[in-house]
Structure formats: C-alpha cells, structure tokens
Amino acid sequence: ETDSAKLSQLILQAAEDEIMFEGPNTIAAFIMEPVLGAGGIMVPHETFMPGMQQLCSKHGILMIADEVITGFGRTGDWSGSRHWGVQPDFMCTAKAITNGYYPFGACMIAEHVAEVFERAGADGFVGHGYTYTAHPVGAAAAIACLKETERLDVKTNAAARGTQMFEGAKRLMEKHSAIGDVRGGHGLMTGIEFVKDRATKAPMDPSFGLSVQKVAMDNGVMLRASGTN
C-alpha cells in the first residue's frame, strides 16, 4: 500500500487483530517512537499515533513514547507525541534534556499512572532504583538546559530550519538520481535514502552513505549515515 493514510488504518486494524488474538490482559504496554529516527526517519501518518493511543486506551494497554530523539523541540514541538496531539502514559527521554552536557535520562509518568502507585501504600513500592538515580548534578543540568531551551524557543527555530532543510533535500533529489526518497518535514528530522535505481528501489551499498557522511563532515555539516540512508 502506497497511500500513507490507508496504510495507517491497515496497521491499526492489524494491531487490534493481534491484540485480540493474544488477549488484551496479556499486554502491559505498547512502545513507539513518534518519528522513527534510527531507521532512516520513518514518519507515520498523522492518524497513526492518535489511533494507537485510542486502541491502547480501549484495551487497557499503556502507551510508552520513546522521546529520546524526538523530545524537547526536535520535531518543531516540545515533544514528538505533542506533535501528533497525543499525551502518552509514559515518556522516556534523554539526549536533548541535557544536550550532552551531562549524561542524563528521565521517564515521565502521567498522573493517572502515578496515582496507582501512590494509593497502593506499601504494595505500591517499586524497588527499581540504583546508585546514580536522581543524581543532583544531572537534575540541575537538566533543569538549566530545559530553561535555556525554552528561553531560546528552540522548537520554533527547529520547525523553521527543519522546513528549510527538508525543502533543500527535495531539491537535491531533483538533481541527483542516487536519491530515491526524502522523508521528514517535521522539525529537524529529515532522511535521505540512497538507491541504485529509483524504479526498482535497489538499495545503494551502505558504504555510499558513509562516503556522503564524510564529505558532509569535511564541509562542516553534521549528519548520520544509517544503512542506505
């Protein structure tokens, strides 16, 4: 299926079929990236994440958003979930929460989930902490970084620069037959797929992407090669 809206509905139906086959009571949670990063920037249709949230709510399944890449402005919104109009039950974050100034990650939990543990008394205790949990330096770095991210209005700039980058990548596709697809357009998330032949979508050797990465780096542009992307 090449129509993204129809594909979204087909996947949602397949997901519900699988849920009913396995039994909703056997599924604790569903995890997804709002925009798939490492796979070469795979952007779902705008109906997919809201549809999955409705599906999870219908069957009593928690939704966990992996916002390690998409969080804190990258998509042109404060989170990738918010970009699609979704409030997940959990949001796992890292990277932009401290922008690499200090190693730090955080799992954000919706109030209705937290209340389950808080009201359970001693039975609600989950002993999953470890030595470095809630490190004060990491927490301070995260707060300072997020304040600066907000002050600079990073999300608005990411949206504008992202549009500029996406349109530029599409113009490159018009000039170079080795570019088989350009994906993205949601903030600073754009992927370029390299192919030997556009008609057959025969993939370029992964070494080609690494060569492009090196040339880009030599010219002051940071990008990441991922397979044929």
Feature locations, PLM:
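Conserved N-terminal phosphate-binding loop of PLP-dependent enzymes in the Aspartate aminotransferase
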Residues: 1-229
